[in-house]
Amino acid sequence: MERNVILAKNAGFCFGVKRAVDEAIKYQKEFGKKIYTLGPLIHNNDVVNYLEDNDIFAIELSDADSLKKGDVVLIRSHGVKESVIKDLTDKGLIVKNATCPYVTNIQLKVKKCYEQGYKIIIVGDENHPEVIGINGWCNDSAIITNGKTELENIPAKVCVVSQTTEKKETWNKVLNEIVRASKEIVAFNTICSATDVRQKSVQELSKEADLVF
């Protein structure tokens, strides 16, 4: 039986991931030694192997204790908690930040609103590195929801942001819940435009394919 494989029109690296890979290669050439990234820069074995061939290795945060003063650590596109950057710097490590600019924007908005007394609500996956990192910019105090269950005891003064890869439908659903319950709301739709384009591309592909991965 003949099968045709169709590649989605907008498949490939997103801007943030490509930028992080480019930054890693740039810093390896600049420092001329191993570069350590906090977690894999990308979930693609071919690219991971290419990076390792160029002295760029993924480690877990717990492995940072075994690094030496002057070693170079790269923050990947997902970003990390503010405290992680401080801890790594305090260890004498050279920290280079390749957090996606869109994620950095969320982190700074969360930090500012938290300092202004807003309760932070993040729409996204509580176990995703990006969300874990964002939560760290408000002292790990955010309410995190994936929209599958209704929020309870929503505070009167809230700041709402989204994981960059969240579905627009989920964002709208959660925001509608919050609007009904809160009196003062600052909402930033921080879904990456590339995510929206890719989701629409997959929807179009599903109309002509029997199976979508």
Language-model regions, residue ranges each:
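The feature marks the mature, well-folded catalytic cores of soluble enzymes
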Residues: 1-212
